[in-house]
């Protein structure tokens, strides 16, 4: 497995299907790392702190596209769920014209998923 990982650039998040990363890799859990010991990793993460990717997913940076204005690279964004409401309007077919809010006593909306660790090549 280690040979397959060699092609990843230093600093690239890699989904990892195990609790323990292989030698030479760190879990991406928000921890500091020694800049002097890992200069390649420090070039990618200049603050010498890895992002905490536990329980989160990676979203492509907007970079001026207009879907997620104001975000900076490596910034964190908390979850948000809005109530859907449509007071009416014209719809073709057999519809009531109302959007309905379905509540399941959860505090977030999330897609189906499988839990992996994210790891990063240390250097």
Which residues are covered by each model-predicted region?
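Low-complexity Ser/Thr/Gly/Asn-rich repetitive segments
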Residues: 1-123
